[in-house]
Amino acid sequence: MANSSSSTITIPNFQLQHITHLRDYIPQAQTHPNPLAFNPYFQTFPGFFLSQTDIVLRHNALDLSGTFPTPTPPLAYTRAGPRNRIFFNPTHVHAAVVTCGGLCPGMNTVIRELVVGLWELYGVHEIFGIKAGYRGFYSYEPVKLNPKMVDDWHKRGGTVLETSRGGFDLQKIVDAIQNHGFNQLYIIGGDGTMRGAVEIFEELKRRKLYISVVGIPKTVDNDVGIIDRSFGFQTAVEMAQQAINAAHVEAVSAVNGIGLVKLMGRSTGHIALHATLSSRDVDCCLIPEIDFFLEGKGGLFEFLEDRLKEMGHAVLKAEKDESGNPVFLDVGVWLKSELKNWWSRDHPNELFTIKYIDPTYMIRAVPANATDNSYCTLLAHSAIHGVMAGYTGFVCGPINGNYAYIPVDEVAKAKNKVDTRDHRWSWVRSVSNQPDFIKC
């Protein structure tokens, strides 16, 4: 209950989302004491081990007036962390780690921390890396991993295990998992990879196999839903600053200069939004969530003409599709062409320069920065604790700053688009003074 001077408001009960446990379909699953209780580096004070009563709320800010609806009842998730009893004997664990899809800063850090965490926290020594994504389960021999081997992987970009797109053959993958004797699967990838993880989880459950599956969501453009952010995003925003700085220098160094930067973003504009707020050098931020037009009152050309008259230069930023999928227009190349045609048509005798920068691969191929490295460690350890506790078919990630376990099928379906009604988009427009692109 929430009390005020004039009334009493009833806060609704919360609905705890179910995370599948091995005991749901293997009732005879045995438990073991958590070795962390005997680890000299940990002080297992009261509350150190979590239970089913520890939850994380999906929404920690509710509009009780009903103006902005929230799910009824509001959702809650199981809190991530170690449990007092575990459902795997560490000496019997055979863990597999796989990376799928495109590159993202922090992939190697997650691999490293999974290996070190399993080894040092739980005494698991049979840890294997799967090469080249999902197809690696049935096409390549697993690579034995240990802490010494992965010691400096967090300093490298990309993924040492290598990755690929496609190659998802459910029966071949699950058969290979059985044949190799894996009983823990750590799957690192984006939304497509998580959809594959759902199928693997369902097939393992159908076969009633004692195997836990956890997804660690990866997408550099931060389009994974439910969780606060995906790993690598902070690094991507930081690297985007270099491209913006270069575009700004090029623009101010020319007469009527325009710097055009195309950033990654598969139908979401999070990198562009945050990079704009961080740099303060961007005059117009174009994101997929907002339609814009070129000609006429309130259009992009009118805005740029005014900005060039006032400042003598402008910096534009747009987002593109990460996957390179041909159904997505290459907005950067198209916009560069349209800008050149506009200027030559309307100002044929005036100087004009446009410098186009596409830092896509620079952004996604670099090592994780300090913030993302720390984040990747927490994600990896949260995944390990959940799997050792017997949970399966889940994703780990922060919700409102608290780490939680989320059903993998929910994450596979959820999207995280920029909410243009949110105050952050208003901040972008206040920084850039750009039009709202509403036709008059």
Q: Where are each of the predicted segments found?
A:
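Short glycine-rich or small-residue beta-strand-to-loop segments that form or flank ligand, phosphate
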Residues: 94-104, 159-162, 183-189, 215, ...
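Accessory alpha-helical/coil subdomains and C-terminal extensions
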Residues: 176, 187-189, 195-204, 208-210, ...
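A glycine-rich phosphate-binding loop feature that marks nucleotide/adenosyl-phosphate handling sites
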Residues: 260-267, 358-361, 397-404, 409
